C-alpha cells in the first residue's frame, strides 16, 4: 500500500459526511505496498482503512468489495466494506474511486512457524468454502493472459538470462491448463503482510484487490512460496514441515483431489512466475508516487528457479 494521491483532513472530513461512521479524528498515510493509496482513518465511531484505487479497472472493483462483504458475512475475518448513505460500497475522492473498510486488529508475522502456517491453511480453506456461494465472477486479473502481456512489455528490458528464463517458463506453463481442478474466488496475494495475528490466531486477512476466480490450489501455492521458505533471504527452497502444516490444515476442511496433488509443482512455478513478473514490471516500469514501496524482483526469480529445479518432490503429505 503506497501513497500516490494526497488527501487532506478537510477533504476527508467532507467525504465522510456521506457515511454513518462519525466524524474524523485522525488520518495517517500507509506507505507499505505498491498498488493503491491507503490511509488509516480513525473516527469518533471506529477505525477504518481508506483506499483510493490508482490503476485497477473500475469494472473490477465491485467484485473485490462484494467478495469482502460476502466473506465477512460468512465469518471470515476480513475487512468489511462500509456502504455510504446511498448504500454503495464504491465512491469517489479526489478524482479516484475510493472505498472505506473496517480496520482489523492484529499485526503481521515476519517469521511464521509451523503453528502460523497451520492457522493460515485452515483459514484459507474456510475462505474457499465460503467463496463457493459468491455469485460474481472475475477471472484472475494476474493470470496467464496478464503474464503474456507483461512479458511482451518487459522482454526488451531484460538481460539474456532473464529473457531465457521467462521464455522457458511461459512455454512450460502453456503446456498446462487445469479445467478440472476445483475453482472459485481466490485471494491470490496472501503474503505474510496480508495476514494479521493476535494472541497466536489469525485475526484478519487484508488486501483483496488482486482477488479473482482461479484454481483454488493457486492460492496455496502463493502462500507456500512466501510463508514456507527455509529462509527468505538466504535459502528460498520450501521448508517441508511448514508446507506440511499448511497443506494438512487446509485438507482437514477441504480435502485435495489426486489432480490437485499432481498439479502442485506447476502451481508453485505459476505463483513464482506471476510475482516475478509483477516485481519486474514495478521495477522497470514504475509509477510516480509520493510514498512508493517496490520489491526486488530477484527474490522471485530465485524462487522460480528453485521450484523449476525441484518440481518432482514438492508435494508434502
Model-derived regions: residue spans:
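An alpha-helical support segment within catalytic cores of ATP-dependent transferases
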Residues: 7-18, 135-136, 147-188, 198, ...
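Conserved NTP-binding catalytic cores of kinases and kinase-like/nucleotidyltransferase enzymes
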Residues: 1-85, 198-201, 314-317
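Active-site acidic catalytic loop and adjacent metal/ATP-binding pocket
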Residues: 31-44, 49-50, 81-82, 173-218
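ATP/Mg2+ or Mg2+-diphosphate-binding catalytic cores
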Residues: 141, 152-153, 275-317
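A cross-family kinase active-site recognition segment
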Residues: 110-163, 181-183, 291-294
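ATP-binding pocket architecture of kinase catalytic cores
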Residues: 42-135
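Active-site activation/catalytic loop segments of kinase-like enzymes and analogous catalytic loops
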Residues: 217-255, 269-287
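All-alpha amphipathic helical-bundle segments outside canonical DNA-binding/catalytic cores
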Residues: 258-268
